[in-house]
C-alpha cells in the first residue's frame, strides 16, 4: 500500500500553557510550518498555535 500524504501534527499554544490541538495536514500543499490562531481555554483568549511533531 502507498503511504498517505496527510501527516498528523500537534498544534501547541504559544501562550506557554501546555494546551494543544491535534490535526492533520497535507504535506504536499503545506510543506512549511503551520500557524493558526485558535482559542486557548487555559488563558481564555485566542492565541497563535504553532505546529509541532506528535511524539
From Swiss-Prot:
Keyword tags: Ribonucleoprotein, Ribosomal protein
Any GO CC annotation of this UniProt entry: cytosolic large ribosomal subunit
One term of GO molecular function: structural constituent of ribosome
Xref: PROSITE patterns: RIBOSOMAL_L33 (PS00582)
Cross-referenced InterPro entries: Ribosomal_bL33, Ribosomal_bL33_CS, Ribosomal_bL33_sf, Ribosomal_zn-bd
Superkingdom, natural source: Bacteria
Pfam families: Ribosomal_L33
GO biological process, alphabetically ordered: translation
Keyword S-adenosyl-L-methionine in annotation: no
HAMAP family the UniProt entry points to: Ribosomal_bL33
Family that this chain belongs to: Belongs to the bacterial ribosomal protein bL33 family.
Name of the protein in question: Large ribosomal subunit protein bL33
Amino acid at each position: 500500500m502507498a503511504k498517505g500524504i496527510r501527516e498528523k501534527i500537534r498544534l501547541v499554544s504559544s501562550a506557554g500553557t501546555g494546551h494543544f490541538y491535534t490535526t492533520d495536514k497535507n504535506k504536499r500543499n503545506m510543506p512549511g510550518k503551520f500557524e493558526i490562531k485558535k482559542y486557548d481555554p487555559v488563558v481564555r483568549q485566542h492565541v497563535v498555535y504553532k505546529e509541532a511533531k506528535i511524539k
